Amino acid sequence: MMAEDRRARVRALLDAVRAEGRTALTAPEGKVLADAYGIAVPGEELARDVDEAVACAARFGGPVVMKIVSPDILHKTDAGGVVVGVEGAADVRAAFCRIVANARAYDASARIEGVQVQELLPRGQEVIVGAVTDPTFGKVVAFGLGGVLVEVLKDVTFRLAPVDADEALSMLDSIRAAEVLRGVRGQAGVDRWAVAEQIRRVSELVADFPEIAEVDLNPVIATPEGAVAADIRVILAAGAPKERRRYTREEILTSMRRLMQPSSVAVIGASGEPGKIGNSVMRNLVDGGFAGEIHPVNPKADDILGRKAYKSVTDVPGEVDVAVFAIPARFVAAALEEVGRKRIPNAVLIPSGFAETGEQALQDEIVAVAERHGIRLLGPNIYGYYSTWQDLCATFCTPYDVKGGVALTSQSGGIGMAILGFARTTKTGVSAIVGLGNKSDLDEDDLLTWFGEDPHTECIAMHLEDLKDGRSFVEAARATVPKKPVVVLKAGRTAAGAKAAGSHTGALAGDDAVYDDILRQAGVIRAPGLNEMLEYARALPVLPTPKGDNVVIITGAGGSGVLLSDAVTDNGLSLMEIPPDLDRGFRAFIPPFGAAGNPVDITGGEPPTTYEATIRLGLEDPRIHALVLGYWHTIVTPPMVFAELTARVVAEFRERGVEKPVVASLAGDVEVEEACQYLFERGVVAYPYTTEKPVAVLGAKYRWARAAGLLGGGS
């Protein structure tokens, strides 16, 4: 069927259903959609009475499945409206009567159109293919193990719809039971292409018709010969969602450039009185060394911190790039009108007292003012922002000026301050720290678009509680990930789960499950916690990009080697199978009671020369792509001796063009802390008292390299 013809056919059907005031399609109506989009379903007919049911069953010539058809009964099994394996005229008659009686008992007011008589499919692997409308990401397609246990097993994966054939196939390998589909215990695998086609076509259907809220094919019977949907359920949305205003990439970059690289900043509510937010913002801007113009705005002052104060922002001479608000929430809308008349493109709203306290109307008002004047809003309810390469500290919190390549954002002020403390403690250089707060306008996809192009930014780490527009974020992430890593800490992993849903797919699509799969699809590295997000952010720019999958562990302690091996496996990395010649090479440097293999156990009492020789061999051999070092504190090789020799050898090889990621776990007394800091500052990611953290960082680097297309195997 031609694309235009099938869309016209489906459009006519959906309009008719809407005209009747219904949101659920009947099974025969679902078959119309399936046929239009090439979704394989069994032969079936609608029987309006007993005699028609007998005739239908006779035409199929074998056992049949019989199902109630009612626009008012969504879950047919719950209503006793499904009978499987019916054969013979007498049984068909009895089943028809029983199904109708059960349906009337279930819902006496239900409209009953008849009974669907469907050919019985052969036994096979039951899977579910579906689609839901996610509040964050829009149309999302789902795949997993199906049948009656689908909501118990919850072995399901999600992708943004529509998907192409390759993405659909990748979903088959993304569930825990992936091997079942390939065939286990002598059973043949399923026709993977046929299953993937069901996924692709469902995704195409919901992308073409936004009013379709949910689609369920459950179960799909998958066999070596094909994949057929035994049941199809379609639910329509009650109303169209509100469209969010979208900005072009060029518009975002133009606005963000003036926000992050301003020449002139006005502080509305600036104060000369210590303890006031307006004073703290002014003090940070002035003391931070910002080279641009700083204009305090306060109708009651003539001079603030040596700067001329203005009664209104409209009195400020020349262009202004950013207006920072440090006034109570109730005065923001009026002041924002003046910002609009001044044609200032960006407003940074520090005040709280908006939607986060229930004052949604007040927030809606400032958004309307901003949209009318073309102002982009950062906030409200934020600590401000730092743009270190501009010496810009527009915040009422403690200043920070250590320049570097890490851009950090947070939706929460408390998390923002944790970011600041971590950066200071670890001496992490940052390109920016930005608070997002209520995200009335500017959000993560705007910042991601900017940081993706910012030459000062090498890694982006974002704390978020939600995304206003998941598709825009994914679009920005896909454009950024090939150039630099994006790390996300998504809060609310254990939030409530699925709301009441009309389909199995809807019940399975809990917020976090969808976030997890789609962030991975976008190439984003998801951090399990705040510390991991911060450690990934500071460590990923330090590590060179691996050129292959072979990881070798060199350790001075067997126990650490076992734990490091576990961590390698847990992080999806590959321990190299050591070939005989390399095994002989390592054995030449370690005592007879040591162990080559992988891990290479040099034992704890070895001198610095053994560490150096084995590390050199690991860096020299081109078959090895990454090193994990396990150090055990001994007087023979003190921590700083180990750190200095490791840093020296790694630097020597990098000067020769051999750049491999090297991470280290240091076990010992407190001296290992200084040794780790020394190594970190010299390009070896090292942590004391943990075997998990250095390998987790290496795993994150590998995930990014795959997502960026620098290694095979996907993300």
What are these regions (language model features)?
Residues M1-S715:
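Catalytic-core regions of core metabolic enzymes
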